[in-house]
From Swiss-Prot:
Pfam families: PPDFL. It comes from the Eukaryota. Coiled coil: none annotated. It comes from Xenopus laevis. Probable regulator of exocrine pancreas development. Keywords: Developmental protein, Differentiation. Belongs to the PPDPF family. This is Pancreatic progenitor cell differentiation and proliferation factor A. One of its GO terms (biological process) is cell differentiation. The keyword Metal-binding does not apply.
Amino acid sequence: MAAIPSSGSLVATHDYYRRRLGSTSSSSSCGSVDYSGEVIPHHPGLPKADPGHWWASFFFGKSTHPVMTTVSESPENSGSFRITNGLVPCGLTQESVQKQKVSDSKSNSSPSA
């Protein structure tokens, strides 16, 4: 069975991006044993972040919207859903939500026998 590499390989990749080569010579090889890199200083104008997750804010920025939307299935129709907090969940268009609201208001205003 193949062994799963430890996190050392990830650290090596990370160190590659945090260091720059001390030599600009084109004759140096990438696999050189005598690699001497220097740590690139942090720019004072940039915010410091966890180096393992600096990219997360680009994809998972802080949202002002709630993460979860409460959606309940209508007991009358097994295919219709009601949104309780006004947010549209993925896969539903604003048009379909408005149609649902119109049909709900019509069913609520109809006289009962």
